[in-house]
Design a protein with these regions (language model features):
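Short alpha-helical transmembrane segments in multi-pass integral membrane proteins
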Residues: 1-18, 76-141, 185-241, 297-364, ...
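Hydrophobic transmembrane alpha-helices of multi-pass small-molecule transporters
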Residues: 60-63, 175-179, 205-209, 281-284, ...
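Transmembrane alpha-helix boundary and packing residues in multipass membrane permease domains
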Residues: 21, 25, 37, 74, ...
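Small-residue-rich hydrophobic transmembrane alpha-helices
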Residues: 48-108, 145-164, 271-335, 368-382, ...
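Helix-terminus/linker motif at the lipid-water interface of multi-pass membrane proteins
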Residues: 30-49, 118-125, 181-188, 248-277, ...
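Residue-level signal for short hydrophobic patches within transmembrane helices
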Residues: 7, 11-30, 34, 57-64, ...
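Transmembrane helical elements of multi-pass membrane transporters/channels
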Residues: 16-35, 137, 171, 200-204, ...
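Short runs within selected transmembrane alpha-helices of multi-pass transporters and secretion channels
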Residues: 69, 137-156, 164-172, 193-208, ...
Length: 441
């Protein structure tokens, strides 16, 4: 079902569009969490540390593809809002070839650089063997990440957030079943967890590609070389590259912090691995709502409905902040039971450190909720450069403070650097909005 976000109730249209996206990402988090949970409970702390560190690296690599697809998706939304089908077809063709090229290049580089990662990430020797094996298999799934994100970006741009949910649901269920079978039944260690994830990724990627190509004639223009226009290639590169930079800078900062975390040893690594999964799961709905809000703004910006944009912005802030307050309270109260899901009850030190992490981060989710709205707003209004600026402020602050504070107060300094970065970026983004409001829309 395609949804025109330029008409009807603002709150209803945003929520109806956002809910399938939120459910889809919940499922995606489920098959990320499946690896962590099963590995943590059945393979021990070193395996958990290996999978956790690998997840941070893979998040960085896939963020490059995700950023390119998100930037292209914003352009698709604008063209859909304008009703310009010719430009939409040309954007689809240009973006497909460009992002496919980047994906192939990224996949080759990831294998070539695999052996150098231990030094860069400061991975302890007792963890590296499992991590190397896990990453080698996971890298095979990078093309599947491209397929899913490219075709889902088109579907969401035209207001269809339900179909991507279907394919993620199948993928998530399959991943969990295969995780249990490969790790517990066949005793395949961390390699089994990686294989389960890769198989699930290809099921969702190939499935959504076949569906979209079959049901939407516009998308079949990606094979039409006559739709590959030079000006559209430049447009896609200039627009999506900035969104890619935003996503990759954000995750590069996290990756740099991962290296610092690794220097504190397997206990802190394992606590961070579990805590990050819970953290991402907790604020993921406001991240998805920010992406849905971005599509809403982009469609209405293309249709030149500025009053609807202003009303939508006010509604989005209220919805996002209300959710953040609720989820902050829940994470703060239930931090210990949440950590116990991922870590054996006998690993007291890991649980204690994870609880400390969650309570510091969870108390300030309103900061990240506001930041996701600002990212979505500036991307939709054709100002992805501002999203990059906010990301650099947020992550730059996080990295610098993490190294400074950890040398003074220990590992807690790393945890405190995160919310400080969020709020500095929020302040910058809000000041820019106030100063440029009349120019934006």
């Amino acid at each position: 079902m395609n949804q025109d976000l330029t008409k009807g109730s603002i709150i209803k249209s945003m929520l109806l569009f956002a809910i399938p996206m939120i459910l889809g990402d919940l499922l995606q988090q489920c098959y990320n969490i499946a690896d962590t949970l099963i590995v943590g409970q059945f393979l021990g702390r070193n395996a958990l540390a290996a999978v956790g560190s690998s997840f941070t690296l893979m998040t960085f690599l896939t963020s490059i593809i995700l950023g390119l697809c998100m930037g292209s998706g914003a352009l698709f939304s604008m063209r859909f809002g304008e009703g310009n089908e010719k430009a939409l077809r040309e954007n689809l063709c240009a973006s497909f070839f460009f992002i496919a090229f980047v994906t192939v290049l990224l996949n080759i580089l990831s294998f070539l650089c695999l052996d150098s990662l231990r030094i860069f990430l400061q991975v302890p020797l007792e963890v590296w063997s499992d991590m190397h094996f896990y990453l080698f298999i996971i890298f095979l799934g990078i093309p599947a990440v491209f397929l899913y994100n490219y075709f889902s970006s088109y579907l969401r741009a035209i207001g269809n957030s339900v179909v991507p949910l279907w394919f993620l649901a199948v993928s998530a269920i399959l991943n969990i079943i295969l995780d249990l079978w490969f790790v517990i039944g066949l005793h395949l260690s961390v390699g089994g967890a990686a294989e389960a994830t890769v198989v699930a990724q290809y099921v969702s990627g190939i499935g959504i590609a076949i569906y979209t190509l079959t049901h939407f004639s516009q998308v079949r223009s990606i094979w039409n070389i006559h739709c590959l226009k030079k000006e559209r290639i430049h447009e896609i590169i200039s627009f999506s590259t900035l969104t890619c930079v935003q996503q990759s800078v954000m995750n590069l900062g996290i990756l740099m912090v991962q290296g610092l975390v690794n220097s504190f040893g397997p206990i802190v690594m394992a606590a961070f691995a579990a805590g990050v999964k819970i953290d991402a799961f907790a604020y993921m709905p406001v991240q998805d709502f920010g992406n849905a809000f971005s599509t809403f703004i982009a469609q209405n910006y293309g249709a030149r409905k500025n009053d609807r944009i202003r009303s939508g912005l006010k509604s989005a802030v209220c919805i996002s902040m209300a959710f953040c307050i609720v989820i902050s309270a829940l994470v703060f109260i239930f931090a210990k039971p949440l950590m116990s899901i991922f870590v054996d009850a006998n690993e007291i030190e890991i649980i204690q450190e994870g609880v400390r992490y969650l309570r510091i981060e969870g108390a300030f989710y309103c900061g990240i909720g506001c930041l996701f709205l600002l990212y979505g707003l500036y991307r939709a209004l054709g100002r992805p450069g501002m999203s990059v600026v906010l990301t650099v402020i947020s992550l730059g602050t996080r990295v610098v403070l993490a190294y400074i504070l950890s040398s003074i107060v220990g590992v807690c300094g790393i945890w405190w650097s995160v919310p400080i970065g969020w709020f500095l970026a929020d302040i910058t983004g809000l000041f820019y909005y106030k100063a440029k409001k009349k120019e934006l829309f």
